[in-house]
Amino acid sequence: MATKIRLARAGAKKKPFYQIIVADVRSRRDGRFIENVGTYDPNQNPAAVKFEEAKTLEWLGKGAQPTDTVKQILKKAGIWEKFVAKSV
């Protein structure tokens, strides 16, 4: 089963709020997911990001591929560097 770490949209109209989830690549954007690993709120200034770091690193270690947007968020949070350092 191929998995991705991606954003699932929540919140009201014109005020998006995103859950950072691990989901099967075949499931819909806001559909079934395996695990919730964090949140992203672009409405705050600066944007608020919360990760469960241990779960995120665990899924990256299992081979879950982050989308481009999630990868940028991981880099800003400093989690991507920890993953790269562990895998080297």
Swiss-Prot record:
Pfam families: Ribosomal_S16 (PF00886). GO terms for molecular function: structural constituent of ribosome. InterPro entries: Ribosomal_bS16 (IPR000307), Ribosomal_bS16_CS (IPR020592), Ribosomal_bS16_dom_sf (IPR023803). One of its GO terms (biological process) is translation. Keywords: Ribonucleoprotein, Ribosomal protein. It comes from the Bacteria. GO terms for cellular component: cytoplasm; small ribosomal subunit. NCBIfam families: S16. Belongs to the bacterial ribosomal protein bS16 family. This is Small ribosomal subunit protein bS16. It comes from Geobacter sulfurreducens (strain ATCC 51573 / DSM 12127 / PCA). The lineage of its organism: Bacteria, Pseudomonadati, Thermodesulfobacteriota, Desulfuromonadia, Geobacterales.
